[in-house]
């Protein structure tokens, strides 16, 4: 019997890097509402008293960047100066330019199906049957802890909570099956007036216990709640935030490889984002079809070229058919050209702000989480 530990972390919507991601994706959504053909690469930087929104955007749309940025910050919960960051009064700086024509001529084509990739790059997709959402358990439950923190903060259950928080879970595996949770780490910003005893009890009773299945917790599970003992200064006052700096939190929590490209603020012509979504869609349908217990797929693209330059698939010894057959089925059932995958997943819609906190994968509301190809794949594989 082989045993191992595996750990993943998540961060809250009030974490500085996630504030930046949400602003960038809010800008993208507002532009896509008006101009489906827009080219958007929006980056945000937040620090005490300011938000800087920059990047390259080519569009016919008009967006009130300042007002939108303030709205996102306030929606997250930073709307009082006593939190160290206030969406009503912070400075909002705009440093947006246009996308290079050199890039544009390589992407746009007369025939949409010939649309080239917006950049070179490698993207990975992954799925596993260890949870009902075909995601690794450590990242799934780390996200759920952060969603719960936001819920009890916003509904007043724990009104001393503040927006900035982080979670980390260490799972125990035997022969690659979950047998329990070894360690729970949860750090949350809080009001200065609350005692550490109240923080520990509130977090345990209102966040940890409602989220983590009791069957995975035992007397040996270790809990680290605000282990530094105090977390009053948080958000952009504690750390600066930047778009695209939580790429492992956004994906599989380290359980699968990552091509390095961030998602937020990028329109679907950027394969960093759209092809990573398509790769997840492919991997999830393969696992849902029963063709493997775990599946990782790598795609690669060249700038200005429509067809992927490579497709690689790995099932870690869990495949029910040969990997070569799976690659053949992927090519047959999924159009992985940039325009093809945009159409396949209906990506030119204002759906991206919601992706920018609590993970891009394992959340059923997104189109790349559908398992509508599973039955066809299973039949084609002869299972």
UniProtKB/Swiss-Prot annotation:
Cofactor note: Binds 2 divalent ions per subunit. Binds 1 potassium ion per subunit.
Ligand binding (Mg(2+)): 17
Disulfide-bonded cysteines: none
PROSITE patterns per the UniProt record, alphabetical: ADOMET_SYNTHASE_1, ADOMET_SYNTHASE_2
Pathway: Amino-acid biosynthesis; S-adenosyl-L-methionine biosynthesis; S-adenosyl-L-methionine from L-methionine: step 1/1
MF terms in GO: ATP binding; magnesium ion binding; methionine adenosyltransferase activity
Residues given in the record as K(+) binding sites: 43
GO cellular component terms, semicolon-separated: cytoplasm
EC number: 2.5.1.6
UniProt entry keywords in alphabetical sequence: ATP-binding, Cytoplasm, Magnesium, Metal-binding, Nucleotide-binding, One-carbon metabolism, Potassium, Transferase
Region entry Flexible loop, spans: 99-109
Residues that bind ATP: 15, 164-166, 230-231, 239, 245-246, 262, 266
Chain positions recorded as L-methionine binding sites: 56, 99, 239, 270
Catalytic reaction list: L-methionine + ATP + H2O = S-adenosyl-L-methionine + phosphate + diphosphate
UniProt entry tagged with the keyword Lyase: no
Localization: Cytoplasm
Gene3D superfamilies the record matches: 3.30.300.10
PANTHER family, A to Z: S-ADENOSYLMETHIONINE SYNTHETASE
Family as reported in the entry's similarity comment: Belongs to the AdoMet synthase family.
Record function comment: Catalyzes the formation of S-adenosylmethionine (AdoMet) from methionine and ATP. The overall synthetic reaction is composed of two sequential steps, AdoMet formation and the subsequent tripolyphosphate hydrolysis which occurs prior to release of AdoMet from the enzyme.
Subunit structure of this chain's protein: Homotetramer; dimer of dimers.
Protein name as catalogued: S-adenosylmethionine synthase
Source organism per UniProt: Actinobacillus succinogenes (strain ATCC 55618 / DSM 22257 / CCUG 43843 / 130Z)
């Amino acid at each position: 019997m082989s045993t191992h530990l595996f750990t993943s972390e998540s961060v809250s919507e009030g974490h500085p890097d996630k504030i930046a991601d949400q602003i960038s994706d809010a800008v993208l959504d507002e532009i896509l509402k008006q101009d489906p053909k827009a080219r958007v690469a929006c980056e945000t930087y937040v620090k005490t008293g300011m938000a800087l929104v920059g990047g390259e955007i080519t569009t016919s749309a008009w967006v009130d960047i300042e007002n939108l940025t303030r709205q996102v910050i306030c929606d997250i919960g930073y709307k009082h100066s006593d939190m160290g960051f206030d969406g009503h009064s912070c400075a909002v700086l705009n440093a947006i330019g246009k996308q290079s024509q050199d890039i544009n001529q390589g992407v746009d084509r007369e025939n949409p199906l010939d649309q080239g990739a917006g950049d070179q790059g490698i993207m990975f997709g992954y799925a596993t049957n260890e949870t009902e959402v075909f995601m690794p358990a450590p990242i799934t439950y780390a996200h759920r802890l952060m969603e719960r923190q936001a819920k009890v903060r916003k509904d007043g259950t724990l009104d001393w909570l503040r927006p900035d928080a982080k979670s980390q879970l260490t799972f125990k595996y035997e022969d690659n099956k979950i047998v329990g949770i070894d360690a729970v780490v949860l750090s949350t910003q809080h009001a200065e007036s609350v005692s550490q005893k109240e923080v520990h009890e509130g977090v345990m009773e209102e966040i940890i216990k409602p989220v983590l299945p009791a069957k995975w917790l035992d007397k040996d599970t270790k809990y680290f709640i605000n282990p530094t003992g105090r977390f009053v200064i948080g958000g952009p006052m504690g750390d600066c935030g930047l778009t695209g700096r939580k790429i492992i939190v956004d994906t599989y929590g380290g359980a699968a490889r990552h091509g390095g490209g961030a998602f937020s603020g990028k329109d679907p012509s950027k394969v960093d984002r759209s092809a990573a979504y398509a790769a997840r869609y492919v991997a999830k349908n393969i696992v849902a079809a029963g063709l493997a217990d775990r599946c990782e797929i790598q795609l690669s693209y060249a700038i200005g070229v429509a067809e992927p330059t490579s497709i690689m698939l790995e099932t870690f010894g869990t495949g029910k058919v040969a990997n070569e057959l799976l690659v053949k089925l992927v090519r047959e059932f999924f159009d992985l050209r940039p325009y093809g995958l945009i159409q396949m997943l209906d990506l030119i819609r204002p759906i991206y702000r919601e992706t920018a906190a609590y993970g891009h994968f394992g959340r059923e509301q997104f189109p790349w989480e559908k398992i509508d190809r599973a039955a066809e794949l299973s039949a084609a594989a002869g299972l």
